[in-house]
């Protein structure tokens, strides 16, 4: 009976996933296309010592206390360019944070893995607009993301001048495609530091060049996620 139940659960779990029918072996999409799983993790390296010493951690869901497990290697939220996968819409992702004091942001770090296409994305710091990402405060075009399914490198975007943010005001870190990344397929890794409390995330979907977003076309949609996206916002007081 136990074996039969386990087999049934396994079949149901596999039924909720769909194999990625392209050149990347071991990459599986959820049925709705929103999540990516790496079933064959790639070679990982321990993250090099960070240059974040002395910086204020305004928000941090990257497990720096555990350099061999700063985030979960093998599952993440889908980021698609408009021509990345035939039959799939364009997807962007965002994670919210609220500073408890006034700060100056000088660095944003994200745990995002590259699957295929152009290895580059846009990272942005955004204001809030009624609970979803609003206007871009600052954006960075970033290339050379680590391979999805590996751990534990992160990608950083810096601003030497600094960006002022206000206490008790919600902001968003956005990872999206740009002009050069129309065929990019990537995934924002889920965090490993808190698997109890939910985090506010949002996705943006566009079916202008294919796929279907239903009633959510070309708008941000927010929701709670457990676990949330792995990212950090650093700076000074």
Q: Where are these predicted regions, by residue range?
A:
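Positively charged n-region of N-terminal signal peptides that target proteins for export
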Residues: 1-5
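Bacterial N-terminal signal peptides
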Residues: 9-16
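Sec/Tat signal peptide C-region and signal peptidase I cleavage site
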Residues: 17-21
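Boundary/junction segments of secreted and surface-exposed precursor proteins
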Residues: 22-82
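Short, surface-exposed beta-strand/loop patches at domain edges
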Residues: 55-70, 167-170, 175-237
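Short beta-strands within extracellular/lumenal beta-sheet-rich domains
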Residues: 87-101, 155-159
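Extended extracellular/luminal ectodomain segments enriched in beta-structured repeat modules
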Residues: 100-109, 118
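Aromatic- and Gly/Pro-enriched, solvent-exposed loop/edge beta-strand patches characteristic
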Residues: 114-201, 205
């Amino acid at each position: 009976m136990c074996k039969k139940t386990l087999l049934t659960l396994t079949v149901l779990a596999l039924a909720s996933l769909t194999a990625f029918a392209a050149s990347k072996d071991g990459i599986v999409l959820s049925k709705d296309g929103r999540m990516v799983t790496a079933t064959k993790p790639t070679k990982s390296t321990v993250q090099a010592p960070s240059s974040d010493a002395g910086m204020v951690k305004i928000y941090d869901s990257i497990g720096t206390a555990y350099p061999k497990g700063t985030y979960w290697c093998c599952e993440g939220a889908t980021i698609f360019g408009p021509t990345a996968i035939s039959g799939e819409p364009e997807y962007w992702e965002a994670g919210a944070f609220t500073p408890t004091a006034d700060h100056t942001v000088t660095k944003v770090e994200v745990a995002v893995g590259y699957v295929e296409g152009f290895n580059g994305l846009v990272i942005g710091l955004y204001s809030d607009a009624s609970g979803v990402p609003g206007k871009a405060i600052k954006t960075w075009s970033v290339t050379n993301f680590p391979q999805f399914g590996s751990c534990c490198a992160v990608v950083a975007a810096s601003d030497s001048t600094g960006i002022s943010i206000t206490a008790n005001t919600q902001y968003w870190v956005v990872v999206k495609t740009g002009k050069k990344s129309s065929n990019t397929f990537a995934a924002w890794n889920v965090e490993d530091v808190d698997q109890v409390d939910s985090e506010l995330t949002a996705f943006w979907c566009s079916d202008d060049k294919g796929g279907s977003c239903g009633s959510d076309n070309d708008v941000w949609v927010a929701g709670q996620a457990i676990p949330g996206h792995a990212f950090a916002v650093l700076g000074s007081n």
